[in-house]
Amino acid sequence: MNTYIDIGINLTNKQFNHEHEEIINRALDNGVEQMILTGTSVRGSKESVEIAEDYPGILFSTAGIHPHDAKSFNNESISELRNLLKQDRVVSVGECGLDFDRDFSPRPVQEKCYRVQLELSIEVSKPLFLHERAAFKRFNEITDEYLYRIPKAVVHCFTGTLEEAKIYLDKGFYLGFTGAISDQNRFKHLEEVIRYVPLDRMMIETDAPFMLPKNMPRMQNRRNEPAFLPYVAQTIAHLKKISISEVAGETTEAARNFFGIEF
């Protein structure tokens, strides 16, 4: 069986309440041997770390504040995130960045919150788990101010254009891909992105419970979960005309090296 790492799961989402053990066991049964829980607020990051503590070597976590939650950011948030990031099972700073699509937090507040997390990444020497939506220009202007000091970065759930992908690759960033790559109605443009991006600069993720792959059998429950990660690898293999095992091996190695995860 191929083995995988899911670099982004929202296991604290209420859709997964009281099902953590079942979700994790189904993932393991499908070759998803390690998973990284996404922290999107101070509270959510703490919850993710607590869950990860119960599954050493299998679950890890990020710690950060999503741009939607930037409005809750204050000085206390910085010290709380710093303390979380000192823990070994917390492997990345984020999910952080800018989201100008819905503007759930005021843009100046998003920018300040993002800058603080860029600085935290430099301080604790842990990579960045980045979010950018409808904010490409401003996101890059801010990121470029820190570019030569930040350790490493992955743009999570990438759905941008080929030109945007090239710009991120030129910065040395990695790209995270979800089930969106199998959605030919909304994201057909990602086919050329997948063909272009080198396999050793890709990581795969479910972003569960969101981004359900379109290339899997139709189910009553339309909720995504980490057990479905192989369908993302399957789409990449199809578009690149390579084996699924090659996709699994390369993306797993990339994720382990990037996040410093041992198996």
Residue locations for each model-derived region?
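Mid-domain alpha/beta scaffold segments of enzyme catalytic cores
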Residues: M1-F263
